[in-house]
A protein has these predicted regions:
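Extended catalytic cores of very large enzyme megasubunits
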Residues: 1-396
Length: 396
């Protein structure tokens, strides 16, 4: 309404008001901490707390946390990831076999169909993913998604700010999720998703979030170091050309049908520049992002158990990283293969745990006493944030 951005003091006022409403008995201490530490930027709350402080967090308290980690060991993990990412929370996830193998086997959807009106909310988008997956994990009928209730592209988002993406990103996401599920089901009823397939599904979900106007989806995936598909999912792909038709002589663009050598997967109508065709003729391979661009939505790291990897095995893995030409995968050293991390790898997280973040500005710390006072203020704010636990859309 004022046609300007929120000031720092206004943002702090909004944050204070939210905490005082939750903890009225701590009003004076909250106001003191913000006056002495947050307003002068000696200590900062979580970034999501600053961004969404007030009504957005009161409606969906998971939004106060910057990041989370979850193993993909339950069908609910997929729609929960959509919900969290749309709310601005980054997601780390595991597609290690020990987790993905706990997903139910796939089954043919039941005959018939029904109309499903997609809700115009982050819960509504999550529900659309949930309903689609129920058809393949639980044998329910496939829905006919009705997107008429979703605000058109460019409409103002009242609660969280920004502009609505319209229904197109979600529609494309659901189509791509279904394509992954159908390809997996072609192996036979009862087959389970491979780690690379579960990973691709999360990346397609992130693509919808990327277009959703909240913020770019932040993700990291952890996988078994022996998983060849995950290890090479950001490497150049050996392939054969089935068709190359010039579609623009001036721009030197060609429309191609391509088959990857590793798994025989067909890609149709891929547009390549003449220089890329020349690269293929020389190397017999093309960059991964021409085939599976959604994989760019996550950082990839092999999960390595401390004490269980020899020096030679580690060097061999690093040679694969160099050969990828993409600088990935990274490695994540751990003492527990069921634990994970947030996308920035700042903290180890248990399954389905949030990262409760505060920051201390160490740039202008004067002495030990000053540092300890800032640490106390940061701990106080972190304790306030830890009390926001009404995760109404997530599993208990």
């Amino acid at each position: 309404e004022a046609q300007r951005r929120e000031t720092w003091d206004e943002l702090c006022d909004r944050n204070v008001a939210m905490h005082v409403k939750r903890y009225p008995q701590l009003r004076e201490e909250i106001q003191r901490i913000y006056r002495d530490f947050v307003r002068p930027k000696k200590v900062l709350p979580s970034m999501r707390s600053l961004q969404f402080g007030g009504t957005p967090i009161e409606l969906s308290e998971s939004r106060i946390f910057n990041c989370a980690f979850m193993p993909l060991d339950h069908p609910a993990a997929f729609h929960e990831a959509m919900f969290l990412l749309l709310g601005g929370t980054g997601v780390g996830y595991s597609v290690q076999a020990r987790h993905v193998n706990k997903l139910p086997g796939l089954t043919e959807p039941a005959p018939g169909t029904y109309r499903f009106l997609v809700g115009d909310s982050i819960e509504g988008w999550g529900d659309a993913v949930k309903i689609l997956l129920k058809a393949y994990f639980n044998g329910k009928s496939l829905p006919r998604f009705d997107f008429s209730g979703i605000r058109p592209k460019g409409a103002r988002l009242i609660t969280s700010g920004g502009k609505a993406p319209g229904p197109k990103p979600l529609k494309e996401c659901l189509e791509r999720l279904q394509a992954v599920l159908e390809r997996a089901l072609a192996r036979g009823t009862g087959t389970r998703l491979r780690p690379i397939e579960a990973h691709d599904m999360l990346c397609h979900i992130a693509d919808a979030v990327l277009a959703g106007g909240i913020r770019r989806a932040a993700m990291i995936v952890l996988f078994d170091r022996a998983d060849e598909e995950m290890l090479t999912c950001k490497s150049n792909l050996a392939c054969t050309m089935q068709r190359t038709d010039c579609i623009n002589h001036d721009a030197e663009l060609y429309e191609c049908d391509i088959t990857t050598t590793s798994n025989g997967k067909d890609y149709h109508n891929v547009v390549l520049h003449s220089s890329q065709l020349a690269e293929w003729k020389e190397k017999g391979a093309l960059p991964w992002y021409l085939f599976e661009p959604q994989r760019g939505r996550a950082n990839n790291s092999a999960n390595l158990l401390r004490g269980a990897v020899s020096q030679n095995e580690f060097y061999a893995l690093m040679e694969r990283v160099e050969a990828s030409g993409a600088g990935e995968p990274g490695v994540y050293w751990t003492n527990n293969l069921d634990w994970g991390t947030n996308p920035c790898c700042e903290i180890g997280l248990k399954p389905n745990q949030f990262c409760n973040l505060t920051e201390i500005n160490a740039d202008d710390v004067k002495d030990q006493t000053d540092l300890e006072e800032r640490a106390g203020a940061a701990a106080f704010i972190g304790t306030l944030q830890a009390g926001y636990t009404d995760f109404h859309y997530l599993r208990p």
